[in-house]
């Protein structure tokens, strides 16, 4: 899917919250993207980070917001990832409510300003895809659970679902976004020690992915001088996952601002969770 927008260059104007380091940028940009990686709303953990992110969106006024998916952690359906038929209805409802609360706390304050909204895109992640896996293994649950429970259309302009068994891809301003990009015919995510470099060499375009929870960034220059940016965007949750153990220490937690986005090139700004807390908490 490709979004074609006709944006005028806005005048360089300082944001009202001039004390914010990411608001002092005198804008000459074509477009600004805000990337939200893997929020993993979970019933056992609070969603306070959504309040901080809402304040950032109000101050930043991005043109496009891309949620890379896995906002709904859905631990009640984790067994279906392993091909097991395991489901507890009450736990599923709590999982859904956690994700819905995150959505409401994120977009409620932004909409309350009654200002122009950014174009909002949601990419289905593998955790949301657990619903489809559960229905494939237990079709009798049709009507009890469903993708519609996520209520994404209420707050997002475009919802990019899985294409078969692999994440859907959307192109915006020359950047391809997906929850993850596949490494080959088996449909496994591109990963490894240097995943952004792997994305760049395998795909040959500017791409941004989530899924791995780590941060990695690579820029390559084509023979004609154009820049290809490959980004693995980290995650946006502030708790440690019990199952991850020491891998929690490897995660980068925050959001990414892309300024001056044009034809796949941009100026990145990495806004960590700790920075958001210092400014807005």
Task: Tell where the protein language model's regions lie, with residue ranges.
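Active-site neighborhood of divalent metal-dependent phosphoester bond hydrolases
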Residues: 77-164
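Conserved beta-sheet core of the metallophosphoesterase superfamily
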Residues: 178-273
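Active-site neighborhood of phospho(di)ester-bond hydrolases with catalytic His/Asp-centered motifs
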Residues: 35-37, 64-70, 119-125, 177-179, ...
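Short, glycine/acidic-enriched loop or turn micro-motifs at the edges of active sites
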Residues: 41, 73, 128, 182, ...
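Core dinuclear metal-dependent hydrolase active-site scaffold
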Residues: 6-28, 33, 168-197
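A short acidic (Asp/Glu
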Residues: 45-46, 75-79, 131-136, 188-190, ...
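Acidic, glycine-rich loop-and-strand cores that form catalytic or ligand-binding grooves
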Residues: 143-152, 170-176, 197, 201-204
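N-terminal active-site segment of His-dependent metallophosphoesterases
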Residues: 1-104
């Amino acid at each position: 899917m490709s979004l074609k927008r006709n944006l005028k260059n806005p005048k360089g104007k300082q944001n009202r919250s001039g004390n914010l380091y990411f608001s002092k940028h005198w804008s000459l940009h074509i477009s600004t993207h805000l990337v939200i990686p893997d929020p993993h709303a979970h019933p056992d953990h609070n969603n306070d980070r959504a309040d901080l992110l809402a304040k950032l969106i109000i101050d930043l006024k991005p043109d496009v917001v891309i949620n890379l998916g896995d906002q709904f952690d859905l631990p009640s359906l984790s067994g279906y990832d392993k091909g097991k038929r395991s489901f507890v209805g009450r736990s599923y409802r709590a999982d859904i409510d956690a994700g819905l609360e995150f959505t409401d706390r994120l977009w409620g304050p932004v909409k309350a300003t009654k200002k122009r909204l950014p174009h909002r895109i949601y990419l289905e992640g593998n955790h949301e895809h657990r619903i489809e896996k559960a229905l494939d293994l237990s079709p009798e649950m049709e009507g009890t659970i469903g993708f519609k429970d996520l209520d994404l259309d209420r707050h997002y302009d475009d919802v990019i679902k899985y294409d078969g068994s692999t994440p859907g891809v959307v192109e915006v301003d020359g950047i391809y976004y997906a929850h993850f990009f596949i490494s080959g015919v088996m449909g496994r995510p591109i990963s490894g020690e240097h995943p952004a470099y792997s994305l760049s060499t395998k795909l040959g375009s500017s791409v941004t992915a989530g899924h791995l929870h780590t941060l990695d960034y690579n820029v390559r220059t084509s023979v004609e001088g154009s820049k290809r940016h490959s980004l693995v965007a980290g995650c946006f949750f502030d708790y440690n996952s019990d199952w991850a153990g020491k891998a929690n220490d490897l995660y980068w937690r925050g959001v990414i601002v892309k300024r001056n986005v044009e034809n796949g090139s941009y100026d990145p700004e990495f806004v960590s969770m700790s920075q958001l807390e210092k400014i807005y908490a």
